[in-house]
UniProtKB/Swiss-Prot annotation:
Main location: nucleus
Any GO molecular function: transcription coactivator activity
The protein's name: Mediator of RNA polymerase II transcription subunit 20
InterPro entries listed in its UniProt record: Med20 (IPR016532), Mediator_Med20 (IPR013921)
Subcellular location: Nucleus
GO biological process: cellular response to nutrient levels; negative regulation of ribosomal protein gene transcription by RNA polymerase II; positive regulation of transcription elongation by RNA polymerase II; positive regulation of transcription initiation by RNA polymerase II; regulation of transcription by RNA polymerase II; RNA polymerase II preinitiation complex assembly
GO cellular component terms attached to this protein's record: core mediator complex; mediator complex
Domain of life: Eukaryota
Length: 209
C-alpha cells in the first residue's frame, strides 16, 4: 500500500525551500507537477454539544489529488470530489458545476459552522527520487508566512520499517541544512484501518493545527 508522511517546519524562512531544493537535487530523478493545498478550520456555533463531540471541523483541498476535498471531524472523514455525474445533473441534484464542500459550509451552513482560519500553500514543487515523491511548499495564512511543508509519499508496497528508513533519509537532509525542529506525522486516522487520502489529510491537520 502507499504510505505518506507530512513534515511542517514552523521555524523555516521563505528561503529554506531553496536550501532544501539544493540538498535534495542530487537525488532527484524528475521535477513533476506544481501543486497547492488549502486547509480550513471551522468551529461549530451550536451550544450544549455532547462532551465527546468536538466543535472543530477541518477541510483540506489538494490540487494534486484531483482537487478532492477531505473533511475531518471526530476521527471521521468524508472525501468529496469536483466531478458531477450526468445522472446527478439530469435529475436536478447537481448544477454540473463544481462546488467544494467548504463552500457549502460557508454559504448554506454558515449559521452552524464559522470559518476560523485558512492555511494554504501555492505553486509547490514535486520531486521524484528513486524512493519517494516529495512535495514542498511554503505555507501562508492571513497573518503571513507560517513555514515550510513537505508531503512525503511512497508508492512502493514497502513495510512500515522501510518507509521509516526512507523518511529518515529526508530528515537527515534537513539536519544538513540545520533544520532539526519540526513536526512530523505519519499516523493513520484510525490505526489498523488505512484509507490513503483520509490518512494524508489527518497528517496535514496534525502538523498544521
Amino acid at each position: 500500500m502507499k504510505r505518506t508522511a507530512v513534515i511542517f517546519i514552523e521555524k523555516a524562512t521563505p528561503s529554506t525551500i531553496t536550501q532544501f531544493h539544493d540538498i535534495l537535487s542530487t537525488h532527484v530523478l524528475a521535477i513533476q507537477e506544481k501543486w497547492s493545498f488549502e486547509l480550513k478550520t471551522f468551529r461549530s456555533s451550536i451550544k450544549n454539544l455532547p462532551p465527546s463531540d468536538t466543535k472543530v471541523l477541518y477541510s483540506l483541498q489538494l490540487t494534486h489529488r484531483d482537487n478532492q476535498t477531505v473533511v475531518i471531524k471526530n476521527q471521521s472523514a468524508i472525501v468529496t470530489g469536483q466531478h458531477s455525474t450526468d445522472a446527478l445533473t439530469s435529475n436536478g441534484c447537481s448544477s454540473g458545476f463544481p462546488e467544494p464542500f467548504d463552500n457549502i459550509l460557508t454559504s448554506k451552513l454558515s449559521n452552524i459552522w464559522t470559518q476560523r482560519q485558512s492555511t494554504k500553500g501555492n505553486f509547490g514543487t514535486t520531486y521524484k527520487t528513486s524512493e519517494l515523491i516529495i512535495r514542498a511548499s511554503n505555507v501562508f495564512s492571513s497573518s503571513g508566512f507560517k513555514g515550510l511543508l513537505l508531503e512525503i509519499e511512497c508508492t512502493d508496497p514497502v513495510s512500515a520499517e522501510e518507509f521509516d528508513r526512507r523518511v529518515a533519509n529526508i530528515r537527515a537532509m534537513l539536519s544538513e541544512i540545520d533544520i532539526n525542529d519540526y513536526k512530523l506525522n505519519k499516523d493513520e486516522m484510525n490505526e489498523g484501518k488505512p484509507v490513503f487520502l483520509c490518512d494524508l489529510a489527518y497528517q496535514y491537520v496534525k502538523v498544521l493545527d
